[in-house]
Amino acid sequence: MPGGRRAPDDEIIIRARDVSVQFGSNKVLDGLSLDVKRGEILGFVGASGTGKSVLLRTILGLNPKQGGSIEIFGIDYESAGDDARLAVERRWGVLFQHGALFSSLTVLENIQVPMREYLDLSPGLMHELAMLKIDLVGLQPDAAEKFPSELSGGMIKRAALARALALDPDIVFLDEPTSGLDPVGAADFDELIMTLRDTLGLTVYMVTHDLDSLFQACDRIAVLGQKRVLV
C-alpha cells in the first residue's frame, strides 16, 4: 500500500466487469474490470485520454456504457429502479475537478443543495448540519456566507468537499482534487482526505495526476491504459 495507512476491508463497494464505453467510433474503455474495497483510498492514474474521467462518469451514470456491468453496493445502478437508484445516490458524494459550486449560492447554500434534494429537513437543521460540514473540512465559520467568487482555490476545494459530505456518504469520488493547489495546499488536502477516511469510515475513489497524492494518500493505485486497468 503506497500510503501504508490502513488495510481495506474485503467488502467490495464497486464491482465493474468487462465495461466498454464508446463515443461514436472512438472506444475509450474496452473490457475494463475493477473492484473498489470498503475503507480504501484508491487512486487512478493514467495519461491524458486514457479514460479516467470517463470511467468515473460512467460509474456515476453520467455516461452510457456499451457493454459490461457496474454494481455499486451490490446494485446494478444503470438498470435499477428509481427507488434503488435514489438509495445509491444518497450513499455517495462527488467532488468534481473545479469544484462545480453554484456561483449564485453561498457556501452554506451549496452544501444544503443535496440535503434539499434528498432529505426532508427543517431549515434550522439543514443550517446546523451544513455548519458541521464546514467545520469538518477545516473552513472557518465565516466561510458559510461567502460566494464561490470570494474563495481561494483551496477554499473552493474544501467547500466542494463539504458538499460532497452533506449526506454522510459511504464513498466519495474525487476528480483531480489537488489540481490548481500549491504543494503545501495539496499536501494539506491529502491529509484532510486521510483524516476523513479514518474518522468517518469513508471509501475514497480518487482520480489524480498528482504523484505526491498517489503515494501520500492512496492505499492502492490503479493504472489505466490500453482502455482498461493495467495494474
Locations of regions flagged by a protein language model:
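A short, surface-exposed alpha-helical micro-motif characterized by mixed small hydrophobic
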Residues: 214-216
